[in-house]
Amino acid sequence: MAKETRFYPYTSNGGATLGVSGPDFAILAGDTRSTAGYNINTRYEPKVFTIQDARDRSIVISVIGFAADGRALKERLDAIVAMYKYQHGKNIGLRACAQRVSTMLYEKRFFPYQLQTMVAGIDADGQGAIYYYDPAGCIEKRSHCAAGEASSLMLPFLDSQAPRLQPLSLQTAQQLVRDAYTGATERHIEVGDHLQMLVVTREGVSEQLVDLKKD
């Protein structure tokens, strides 16, 4: 009997992303390992990116799932943000950017980006905020969230720890992120190599790169 062959353009490139927000900061983090099944494509494939670096209006995005879709979404958003600044003479705000990403994903709902997406930054009130999206563009504001291969492990960890440590300080949040990824690398082969953290405060965006398990 002949085997039917169907076109399926999507694949998952592994990894995990995580977001934590506090009174005056937001963190998006992702590991840098890219996989295809049991193969490692590369040990440095960023999943978190800065959209703009303007003072007091810094925005970061994380994309995980199909890496090519992630790059396409990020590059398209870069162009939209640049056009907004050209037309209005100012940087786009976090809430407007978050809504625009939702629209971009919804526009592709019949052939969607195979991604779990987060957008984070400092809102107009000076508070840290994280917006989480499904592939069809449904948007939800959260204090913390996780996506990707190890999300089922990391999210319960955050759910149990973050409320107990309120009000959450930046240093405590960074340690929670490191602990979550340290545990994830012990149990998920798709996660590892390096932890990339983008920390957004009123002063702008800072990046940290921490070594993770490499085997």
Swiss-Prot record:
Keyword Phosphoprotein: no
EC number: 3.4.25.1
Biological-process GO terms, alphabetical: proteasome-mediated ubiquitin-dependent protein catabolic process; secondary metabolic process
UniProt cross-references to Pfam families, sorted A to Z: Proteasome
Similarity field: Belongs to the peptidase T1B family.
Main location, first listed in the record: cytoplasm
An MF annotation (GO) of this entry: threonine-type endopeptidase activity
Organism superkingdom: Eukaryota
Record's catalysed reaction(s): Cleavage of peptide bonds with very broad specificity
Organism of derivation: Emericella nidulans (strain FGSC A4 / ATCC 38163 / CBS 112.46 / NRRL 194 / M139) (Aspergillus nidulans)
Keyword Transcription regulation: no
GO cellular component entries: cytosol; nucleus; proteasome core complex, beta-subunit complex
Knockout or disruption consequences: Strongly inhibits growth in fellutamide B-producing conditions.
Localization annotation: Cytoplasm; Nucleus
InterPro entries in the cross-refs: Ntn_hydrolases_N (IPR029055), Proteasome_sua/b (IPR001353), Proteasome_suB-type (IPR023333)
Lineage: Eukaryota, Fungi, Dikarya, Ascomycota, Pezizomycotina
Protein name: Proteasome subunit beta inpE
